[in-house]
Amino acid sequence: VDRAIRRMWMSAACVFILLMGTLSYIQFFDAQMLMEHKWNTRALYDNYGSQRGSIVVNGTEIASSVKSNDEYNYQRVYSEPEKYAGITGYFSSVYGSTGIESALDKELSGTSDSQFYDRVAQLFSGNSTRGASVELTVDDKLQTLAYQLLQGRKGSIVAMNPKTGEILAMASSPSYDPNKLAAHNEQSVIADYTKLTQDQQSPLFNRAIAGNTYSPGSTFKIIDAVAALESGKYDEKSVIDNPAQLPLPGTNVTLPNFVNGQCATRTQATIEWALAQSCNTPFANIALDLGQEKISQTASKFGYGQDLSIPLKVTKSDFPSDMTKSQLAQASVGQYDVKTTPLQVAMTSAAIANGGVQMKPNLVRSVKTSNLSTLSEFSPEKLRTSTSQKVADQVKQWMVNSVDNGIASGAGVSGVKVAGKTGTAEIGTTGLNNSWFTGFAPADDPKIAIAVVYEDIDVSTGAKLSTNAGKQLFEAVLNK
């Protein structure tokens, strides 16, 4: 009997030790995973039921948490929602978060490591956790203008300070209302989200940095021009063949210049003139001469193929590898499989504007706790050297000529030296194009660098539309 009792006690002790070991493992190793699990109701209410910090532009809250009369305690509210949706994203109890709401979730929710002492102070004072506020670099007036310029069309506008990297505007169209996804009625949230995801115009995409990337069209010729100068084989006096049609090696296809432009008036051209008139064949000839490796290396130095967070994650721009000569010729004019974001195009112009130095783009000016102590504050950060001062200055001069004497003239501002480049990217066989403009102003002391893209535009009106948008953005910043 004693042996049976001892055996029973030993078995019970083993079971107890096993249970304690399992519980300890869960407590120390799986606790974080269980806390963050989507079916943890307590964690859900804690996260969505605390007073989340505000997102602020020019001293005004564009996202805030207000008291609600339900189990969540607080409702996330977005003012001017469509104008800022691509930046703020949404904070949803059903679908999680996107945009700044996601990128700075720990700071906004008050759970970041840097807010530990803040949480302790709130605990002893009996106050509930309150998140930090996030102030953006965006200028509200410029963001409003960018959003208005896109109304009724698909596309994106990015504006930044080329000397600091601060993003001054980032608009995407069509947009959506994040208030509908932040609602506490699960059925209505699911219905609205489903409608948005099924919309063929993809309003949930922030076209400036993510979603479907674009062919850059002739804006890529800025990179070709840099590669040409860096190679030492070309300078401002170099003359390149400018045939109306360039036979693509190994194919029965030709690469044409635009029939109705000035390109047809010359059989040879300098890089400056070819850039101003946006002739295709001289730049294809340059790329074929320099080779894929040189064009690819130059694109990489401007950001193609590089990871980037602003702190929103940016889709990589891509310059393809292992191309045939025919494909390289098409890629040199921003076609074939070259893909980019409007932010990348703006960064390219910004690097030229800033003497070849590319500053890291950033959306966040500061993060401050509820007692106004600063957790982090923006300071300009060099991202990379894209090219030399000498090369940048030469390309800048060519871009100024594109506005003064070329097809980018619609972006000109009276009394201001403006640098710019248009682009037209063919999309399939629809006959429609994506129309680009990128540039900066004033050219001799740049305050703003921009990229504008309109989707599905007729070639006859594209350049006029995109350059006019550029002109208005420049005038807004320069108070013209």
Model regions: which residues?
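Periplasmic/cell-envelope proteins involved in peptidoglycan metabolism and beta-lactam response
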Residues: V1-V189, R207-A208, T213-S215, E293-K301, ...
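Beta-lactam-recognizing serine transpeptidase/beta-lactamase-like catalytic domain environment
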Residues: L168-S218, I223-E455, G462
